[in-house]
Amino acid sequence: MLVVVARKSSSSARVAAHQTRSHRAAMPAGQPHAHEPDGGGASHRRPQSPPSLPAEVVPAFAPPESEDEESWVWSQIKAEARRDADAEPALASFLYATVLSHPSLPRSISFHLANKLCSSTLLSTLLYDLFLASFTAHPSLRAAVVADLLAARSRDPACVGFSQCLLNFKGFLAIQAHRVSHVLWAQQRRPLALALQSRVADVFAVDIHPAAVVGKGILLDHATGVVIGETAVVGDNVSILHHVTLGGTGKAVGDRHPKIGDGVLIGAGATILGNVKIGAGAKIGAGSVVLIDVPARNTAVGNPARLIGRKNGEVEKDEDMPGESMDHTSFIRQWSDYTI
């Protein structure tokens, strides 16, 4: 159930400010505030003027339709975090540090990613500045963050709130880190982009090459074991389950990875190899090995994968966009009507 937040009046804003001050005062002794170092190499400071990045290196996502959508999602995240902090005091300090102490979604996600991906030699302060610079300079990246949050909330029945996705869904976090590494790759800052890819693979078990082009409205459901190769392209509103590989054939060079159209659904354990095209609205069955092009709104299953057709010879086409409907198994329930 979504938590709807009305606009605060001036009096309610003062109450909220008082509650925030009270919460900070009630934090356990020794617990760092959002601007203080934690003693373990991670600092919570926020830069005053993050360095800008040239717009031409960013994928051509559409900017937000309005600032209201991002603001609304952020208001839901904060409301959910306040509710959960009240209900579970053990999480209060964590929720304050990651969400409630930040004035915006870009700062919150930059802080959270930095502390997830830092190491003893790759400091959280450096990563925080890096993430925040990208999200601040490029509205298109922020639009993609919002679209991914909305995708998880609408498609994943296990997602009970935006804050759960932001804080706990490693597929979502891996995609946002990839967006920044893609910017670095296009800027020719390739050693840093590859270092970030390596940290994402270590922490989230998701391996996406920085050169891969990924759209918005992406759901990596469960996400463990997802591999996306260097020249792969993933369109908008695509849903990918765990242990999916978008790989090369092992011997080709150059443009050698799959091209995934908008609204595609790729089932768990599927492998798509080579520079093949998966058309918009196509569905790839779980465990399939795809070595051929799949036309738009068709379903491919099997090893090696083949297109599903009806017994009358007609090719079965989905009427909806599987990447959004998440319909994995309708072709199995009606199996007697189909041939492979």
UniProtKB/Swiss-Prot annotation:
* Pfam families documented for this protein: Hexapep, SATase_N
Top enzyme class:
transferase
Entries under Gene3D superfamilies matching the protein: Hexapeptide repeat proteins, serine acetyltransferase, domain 1
UniProt gene name: SAT5
* Segments of this protein annotated with the region Disordered: 1-67
Keyword annotations for this protein, in alphabetical order, are:
Acyltransferase, Amino-acid biosynthesis, Transferase
Query: In which pathway is this protein known to take part?
Result: Amino-acid biosynthesis; L-cysteine biosynthesis; L-cysteine from L-serine: step 1/2
Matches recorded under PANTHER family: SERINE ACETYLTRANSFERASE
InterPro entries in UniProt: Hexapep, Hexapep_transf_CS, LbH_SAT, Ser_AcTrfase_N, Ser_AcTrfase_N_sf, Serine_acetyltransferase, Trimer_LpxA-like_sf
Q: Which GO terms describe its molecular function?
A: serine O-acetyltransferase activity
CDD domains hit by this protein:
LbH_SAT (cd03354)
The name under which this protein is listed is Probable serine acetyltransferase 5
Indicate, by first and last residue, each region the UniProt record lists as having compositional bias (Low complexity): 1-17, 54-64
The record's family statement is: Belongs to the transferase hexapeptide repeat family.
